[in-house]
């Protein structure tokens, strides 16, 4: 994935091109003042390529079409050096006069100084834009944007064999801004095809998170099987908007009656679904600063009635509440079902920054009633005990009754500083939600890798049915191909030991250590020496997850990609997702124990191949 080149000219070559801004280049630049310039497009070319300095200050580009303002872009135009280019697609404006009124940051003393900014000699027209990968940390089998910033997944639905993944995207830089709905599709949840931008900012503001449903009965009035999107329009205030698609989510029409819902305080990330027992649509809306979820109902996806609110004083109240989801799951061993409400918060996660908490309970179509513990309290439960799984939401209309989710694999504490340039952030692996009972009688949510991922496995390079380990580490080579990318599976019986350690490392003495503490019944993940860690004080960390199974033996599945490790214990009952940035690929797995011998069973190391 992400090796697809849809267009041809290398971006790096453009950085060296230093094309003169003249009539011959098809671009004319007029410097009107120390922080104001005009870019006039006079030639032909599909893209206007803008040079970006990733750490630079933001410039405002007002796009004028035949002299009238069409939209505004925020771009970190290069002042000192060009890190990369981003494309403005001029195709929709063909036949019109296109001008950009550019407001650059203050700090230039004269027009002469302003004209020396690196951007002005590197702006160019081109018929092509290259998205081939230039990043050593781009994952092999995780979804990433071809270029630009990405955060929350949103609007996900399944239709006619295709998984649609939309996401918060900045197509004009690798830091947060210009939020649109990027779009990718897959038939196997592994290999993702980049699609054109789906929904872009308009006069109501940026396009924040939301959800999509397939309106099979045509209740919204846009025809049967239309895809309906609800999203937050974010400007000075946050309002809710609707768009619809009649081509299976490739392009969307903006509803002229937007906004369809307004509130006096921050409310965002509408998540909707059809509630069959009451024959109505249900929407959850995050009342962000009030730490609650608002529950609305509608007959037609346009007119919404507030029915109840949930969350006041419950769960973690430390940060804003965002990105809700609500779905029903069967309770194993019974004929009952329970509802699960996902609530993403930032900050307030168990190890700092952003994280996903959840509640189990009952839902009658209007009100969510949470389960309580033996003391009558509503416990705080976490979906993932790593640092890097946020904004987890599910696909609507997933096949075979599945509840399949995906998250943003980063953390708001340091996402903008991660050591990549062409793109920032990946998604987690897709996961299947399930319920299980803990020793305390409470219901908990499991999160296991989606079954499609098994297709990536090649013949294992290591396969050991049983071995004993002690203080002296036993070391195994990771697959030589694909930078050591692999899936590791094993069962750990601590036997007489107190701790069992798994260390994944490289020749630069960088490593991640996973430790199973048999007495505490916990598993921890130490990435303090994992590679590049100094880009943020919040990145070096040890995360710890409780184990929920009663026995002493723990089963692990560990997915190692170029910049992440995802650990699933006991079929996803305990999960940790953490990003890593080793200076060279990991090459070895070492196993050891302290306090006595431990037993390892069913160790396998699988090379992973996404495309088959």
Language model features: what each stretch is:
Residues 8-16:
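Bacterial N-terminal signal peptides
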């Amino acid at each position: 994935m992400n090796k697809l080149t849809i267009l041809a000219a290398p971006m790096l070559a453009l950085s060296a091109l230093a094309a003169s801004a003249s009539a011959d280049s098809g671009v004319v630049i007029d410097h009107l003042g120390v922080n104001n310039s005009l870019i006039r497009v006079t030639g032909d070319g599909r893209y206007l390529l803008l040079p970006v300095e990733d750490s630079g200050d933001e410039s405002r580009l007002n796009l004028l079409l035949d002299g009238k303002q069409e939209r505004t872009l925020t771009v970190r135009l290069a002042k000192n050096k060009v890190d990369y280019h981003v494309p403005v697609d001029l195709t929709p404006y063909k036949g019109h006069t296109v001008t950009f009124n550019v407001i650059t940051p203050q700090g230039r003393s004269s027009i002469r100084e302003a004209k020396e900014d690196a951007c002005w000699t590197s702006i160019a027209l081109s018929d092509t834009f290259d998205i081939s990968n230039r990043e050593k940390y781009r994952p092999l089998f995780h979804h990433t944007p071809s270029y630009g910033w990405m955060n929350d997944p949103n609007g996900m639905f399944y239709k006619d064999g295709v998984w649609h993944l939309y996401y918060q995207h900045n197509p004009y830089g690798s830091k947060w801004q210009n939020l649109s709905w990027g779009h990718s599709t897959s038939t196997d949840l592994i290999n993702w095809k980049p699609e054109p931008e789906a929904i872009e900012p308009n006069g109501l503001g940026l396009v924040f998170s939301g959800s999509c449903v397939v309106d099979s009965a045509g209740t919204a009035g846009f025809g049967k099987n239309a895809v309906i999107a609800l999203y937050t329009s974010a400007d000075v205030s946050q309002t809710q908007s609707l768009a619809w698609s009649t081509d299976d989510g490739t392009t969307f029409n903006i509803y002229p009656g937007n906004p369809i819902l307004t509130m006096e305080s921050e409310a965002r990330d509408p998540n909707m679904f059809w509630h069959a027992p009451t024959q109505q649509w249900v929407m959850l809306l995050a009342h962000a600063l009030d730490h609650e979820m608002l529950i609305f109902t509608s007959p037609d996806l346009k007119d919404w009635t507030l029915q109840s609110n949930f969350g006041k004083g419950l769960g973690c109240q430390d940060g804003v509440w965002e990105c809700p989801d609500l779905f029903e799951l069967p309770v194993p061993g019974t004929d009952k079902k329970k509802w699960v409400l996902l609530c993403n918060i930032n900050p307030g996660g168990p190890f700092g920054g952003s994280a996903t908490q959840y509640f189990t309970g009952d839902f009658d179509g209007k009100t969510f009633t949470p389960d309580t513990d033996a003391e009558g309290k509503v416990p705080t439960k976490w979906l993932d005990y790593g640092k890097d799984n946020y904004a987890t939401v599910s696909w609507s209309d997933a096949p075979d009754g599945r509840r399949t989710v995906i998250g943003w694999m980063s953390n708001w504490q340091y996402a903008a500083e991660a050591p990549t340039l062409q793109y920032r952030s990946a998604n987690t692996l897709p996961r299947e939600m399930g319920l299980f009972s803990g020793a305390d009688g409470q219901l908990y949510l499991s999160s296991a890798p989606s079954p499609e991922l098994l297709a990536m496995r090649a013949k294992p390079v290591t396969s050991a049915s049983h071995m004993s380990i002690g203080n002296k580490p036993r070391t195994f080579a990771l697959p030589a191909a694909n930078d050591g990318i692999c899936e590791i599976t094993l069962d750990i019986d601590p036997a007489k030991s107190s701790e069992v350690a798994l260390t994944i490392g490289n020749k630069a003495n960088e490593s991640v250590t996973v430790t199973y503490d048999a007495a505490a019944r916990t598993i921890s993940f130490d990435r303090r020496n994992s590679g590049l860690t100094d880009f943020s004080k919040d990145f070096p960390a040890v995360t710890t997850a409780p184990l929920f199974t009663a026995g002493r033996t723990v089963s692990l599945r560990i997915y190692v990609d170029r910049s992440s490790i995802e650990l699933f214990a006991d079929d996803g009952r305990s999960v940790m997702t953490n990003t890593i940035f080793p200076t060279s690929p990991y090459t070895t797995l070492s196993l050891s124990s302290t306090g006595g011998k431990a037993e390892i069973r069913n160790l396998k190391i699988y090379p992973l191949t996404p495309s088959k």
